[in-house]
Amino acid sequence: MTSHIDDNLWIIALTSKCTQENLAWVLLIMGSLWLTMTFYYWSHPGGPAWGKYYTYSPPLSIIPGPKGFPLIGSMGLMTSLAHHRIAAAAATCRAKRLMAFSLGDTRVIVTCHPDVAKEILNSSVFADRPVKESAYSLMFNRAIGFASYGVYWRSLRRIASNHLFCPRQIKASELQRSQIAAQMVHILNNKRHRSLRVRQVLKKASLSNMMCSVFGQEYKLHDPNSGMEDLGILVDQGYDLLGLFNWADHLPFLAHFDAQNIRFRCSNLVPMVNRFVGTIIAEHRASKTETNRDFVDVLLSLPEPDQLSDSDMIAVLWEMIFRGTDTVAVLIEWILARMALHPHVQSKVQEELDAVVGKARAVAEDDVAVMTYLPAVVKEVLRLHPPGPLLSWARLSINDTTIDGYHVPAGTTAMVNTWAICRDPHVWKDPLEFMPERFVTAGGDAEFSILGSDPRLAPFGSGRRACPGKTLGWATVNFWVASLLHEFEWVPSDEKGVDLTEVLKLSSEMANPLTVKVRPRRG
């Protein structure tokens, strides 16, 4: 690899020789050189960040990709529906398998192909996360999602798999999920035959479920004085901050300005989170029990080598609340939208429910385990409307590596456009059609796993950085959807049809909240 002198040394040497008379000429020459280098870097495939790397480390082969603009590269790809824009750019560059682009000074690769996705997601080289200012400001660098690859992160993963999301803990929380489902049914029953927006009910249910699992605190969905409104605001603020594309993450000269007000908003949110979660930890420590009722109890009972500091516990527990709340609500809203839009599919799910459960009692989680068409519907909605179309949080290479035959240097951000993979006609037959039958027909994908083993549909990620709560999330979504479809028929509102327009925040959600009517089915 060719070595090069620090870019700043020649500037210092040149300016030291300046006099007042020739300073203007020196500045003009320096500006011209800077512009020349800027445009030279930009002229390379992939844009300025890749051009800077290629200048000093000429590769054997260059990854295709758009140049974007000088200095900022392809920052425009990350505006609005980034997964759409990136897929279109990959098609234009004929680089669906692997495309390079620049976000300011950040080198990025992205794939829209399942084979290359598997190569990236299962590679130990891409076990780290890229730096994100909002994640660090919100303490998530000490939680499972954003913690740097190393001993601490491996310890968190072990705690999550052995204690927090183990089958025993998931089974122990079955009753609370059933009680929350019953509360949702009660609220919707009181609004039957009237147009209603279901999003707030789903968000409250998801938040209540996570609060009970994580902190052992139970909330009544219909109680306006339960404190859930204030807690929901904290979660929404964190969700919005992490979902914002922060230009300062990719343009170092903006780091001191906080032009998007992200650092200021994080600094206001963190003390409130610390007080809220810290108080709960203190209460649990003061009244410690023999049984581990919730995640706080589990963390407090860990043996000495695995014990976490209070600040680390706050980060881990807050991330659990944050990650487990909106994703479940967003996905169920998409499922109910599809049920209202496709009544024949809804009827088939309800026929299966009636055959397995009957109408004399409510659905139990054990009932869902023997169903085939309902899980197929959930998989098909995940295929068409993946909550994390770019798998939400990107990967970072910790060493030089080779992906799809191309050299990828250490420090490169990698993305997987799962939205593009899920709509690729070379991967799926009639990819734009809503057909749950593709997962249940003979010779189809009845046993198709969405938990990470098949890159064609891996909404929870795959490999070392897969979502640790995927089994709990899958169980919750299937059970609640079964309960809601068993109790009600879902039809579009008279005022509005079903609008499938999406908006990309941290997750891809419905741009316009679903407005429907519900009709009781069980008397």
From Swiss-Prot:
Read off the PROSITE patterns from this record: CYTOCHROME_P450 (PS00086)
- Cofactor names: heme
Q: This protein's superkingdom?
A: Eukaryota
Q: What is its EC number?
A: 1.14.-.-
Question: InterPro entries attached here?
Answer: Cyt_P450 (IPR001128), Cyt_P450_CS (IPR017972), Cyt_P450_E_grp-I (IPR002401), Cyt_P450_sf (IPR036396), Cytochrome_P450_78A (IPR051996)
Identify a single GO molecular function assigned to this protein: iron ion binding
Pfam families in the record: p450 (PF00067)
Binding of heme occurs at C467
Enzyme class, top EC level, equals: oxidoreductase
| Keywords of this entry | Heme, Iron, Metal-binding, Monooxygenase, Oxidoreductase
Similarity annotation: Belongs to the cytochrome P450 family.
Protein name, UniProt field: Cytochrome P450 78A3
What is the taxonomic lineage of the source species?
A: Eukaryota, Viridiplantae, Streptophyta, Embryophyta, Tracheophyta
What gene is it encoded by?
CYP78A3
